[in-house]
Amino acid sequence: MRIQWIVRAASIVVLMLGVGAAKEIEPEAPDQPPAAHPAREDPLARSAPKTLARGAYVSVQVNVDALGFNILGDAANEPSIAVNPLNPANMVIAWRQFDSVSSNFRQGGWAYTFDAGRHWTFPGVLTPGTFRSDPVVDVDAQGVFYYQSLKGNFLMDTFMSTNGGVSWGAPVASYGGDKNWLVVDRTGGIGDGNLYGIWQRFAACCGTNVLTRSVTGGTTWQTPVPVAKWPTFGTLAVGPDGTLFAAGVDGTTSQNFNVFVVARSKDAKDPGVTPTFDGRVVEMGGYMQLGGGPNPGGLLGQGNVAVDH
């Protein structure tokens, strides 16, 4: 029987719609100090890793020690995953790492695999001791991974890995704001290799300018520009012709959790042109949900957009 492997962290990001009233989400900022994590250095503070089988599919815990065991006392959520297009057995996952459940201080955790998710290596966190949230990872057509995260000052860093996620280069300042998202153009067209970062405008660096672009492989980032309808708490996607799409809830005047929007840029792919956008409201029904388990201090999902290729 062929076994399909599913990787698992502490939460799954989906478009969550339901019945309820919209409410404001608090921006991310450190409010508790880091907590000691003695269990990480104690080989006895371990338990069997969590696995779950459902038919031919098996989920595998990724935030494990060097021997594949669960580390007691820590936690993780808000995972993001990317697959190397040149070697699908190579994947990278990013998440918010809580070294101790006694503190909500989070850092940038990650793990990588070279055997299609059967085994994972969790080396630690990026720039230890730095408050990091909203991690997003993506990969370009050449197999270079990019990891973007939000710091406590509402500015983002972007890291680059040329060895499959084993190690990362120095952080590159990338403007930013709360609940950021990242996408890389892998179309092979004029915009191939472009990186795009977006965020909400209510806890951010640059007012109503909420999207930045890199045309230099993430080494530099351009001055942010506005996006029609200001999609909030959503994601990005690149179409086969390089058209850039952004989706989320309407951020025109406030965080309208019951109004969903999609914005589109046909010229963002052109490195010599400042991106412009048009946008529209789309009827999805219901509300994006906030609070409650498993993430009582954050979103229960995001607005997701995807394009067929």
Predicted regions and their residues:
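Bacterial N-terminal signal peptides
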Residues: 9-18
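C-terminal PAP-associated
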Residues: 23-309
